[in-house]
């Protein structure tokens, strides 16, 4: 039977990585949309050639890899260029994700993405799990992890879907504000529940 897909998301500092890694330890196949976004622009991939052709060789490093910082600066303040890039990459990323998910041997597979809601990736999922956390803890974790200021983290939060919007799409919510042992037990509980589902439905 084809595995059903669980979409997993949460804001910066919510602990998505810790949650999905714990599912992985329980034998669940998972794919990170951020990794897929990197795979489609690796050297030798058609998308990288298209990007270099469109923006010029300045977006490549001397080794022929994509210089993300340069590209980000080019598209950050130019909505038209950002749209062009999204129209090129989003279908390729979706395809890459679908290919990796189709290889799953587990009863369900996980698509983890910080932009699950914003990029419409939740449409690839049968069920959505949101990792939620109080904002004060979110700021504290993200500032510590990224060595960033509160203003920088707040700017990232503004660019992401609001907490309310994420929760509106959620079938399940995991509030990740306790210790590691609690998190492991909560993931195990959700995993047991997910094993009883077919196509993401009870």
Curated annotation (Swiss-Prot):
Top-level taxon of origin: Bacteria
MF annotations from Gene Ontology: ATP binding; dephospho-CoA kinase activity
Listed transmembrane segments: none
Entry's Gene Ontology BP terms: coenzyme A biosynthetic process
Disulfide bonds: none
Domain DPCK: 5-202
Top-level EC class as recorded in UniProt: transferase
Binding site for ATP: 13-18
InterPro entries from the UniProt entry: Depp_CoAkinase, P-loop_NTPase
Catalysed reaction equations from the record: 3'-dephospho-CoA + ATP = ADP + CoA + H(+)
Main function: Catalyzes the phosphorylation of the 3'-hydroxyl group of dephosphocoenzyme A to form coenzyme A.
UniProt record similarity statement: Belongs to the CoaE family.
Stated name of the protein: Dephospho-CoA kinase
Organism expressing this protein natively: Stutzerimonas stutzeri (Pseudomonas stutzeri)
